[in-house]
């Protein structure tokens, strides 16, 4: 079962975006040959553009999942440099029938063979290896191969469902001997959840608007999967620069089931797509959209604190600086405010603890409920 998009495909997507002709794809009800069972549902990729990404070290985007089923992957944010993606999946255990709706965060190695398609995770060289330096509560770290090599991690109890909105935030920062990226997720209006931190051996200066996609990773072409993406922008660390990501193009991949998809802008703030089944027939075209992005919104301080895994005095110090920076770019914003505390529930066997703090996290040995 394939969980990860290949580096080869990611590079193809980058190249095809540059040479694409932007035209709308025609759609119609199904009236042609049956869906091929030899391949899965075709993937649809979203390519995002901003006026500039210079000095942008923070990015946010959300996905509203409208239909899903077994072996579905909704990638929310992906970048080529640095190479990573983050999103949510649905997986059904064929033996037990258990359905797991998890979250996944993957980062590729940056050595010369980082894109190797026949290298297993055990063959990852030490030189250029991406490592996970921090692991969030309830997060299971791992590694991958055969689609490039790298490190990945899963939140197996994330528990999203159709109709939920999942928001992702990713931060990049340079360190002495490489680059770190950290991520957090929010399910609807629940508290933000720290995913983890990866460290690349290579240095990267900033994040990209990047890509998103909807994918069938298990060869189940009749299962319908759909979602809409939007509410996305980038920020610099000190808030002096902000770039709305207001331009996007979406396109289906090439395969036996390419025509069975639909891409449509159903409102001004997002772009929606559907794959799987035989409800719609569409030509393989780039479908562009202009997305309305809130002009005066910033990534919430709670999201930043969680993404950086800060708490206590470190969290308060960071928040004080953030409020000072925000007051300089937004005069209506007060420079100080009372920290907002949130509560989480942590369990260890039969022991249950409620933790309340500005950026709460479970004690060692406890798992977040």
Model region roles, listed by residue range:
Residues 63-67, 172-174, 187, 216:
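Short beta-strand segments enriched in hydrophobic/aromatic residues
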Residues 160-194:
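Carbohydrate-binding surfaces in secreted/extracellular proteins
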Residues 258-332, 345:
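Hydrophilic extracytoplasmic domains
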Residues 2-33:
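Secretory targeting and sorting signals
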Residues 32-35, 326-369:
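Polybasic, low-complexity, intrinsically disordered segments
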Residues 35-139, 155, 296-324:
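Secretory/extracellular carbohydrate-interaction modules
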Residues 180-291:
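Aromatic sugar-binding interfaces of carbohydrate-active proteins
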Residues 143-167:
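Short, aromatic/His-centered strand-loop micro-motif at the edge of beta-sheets
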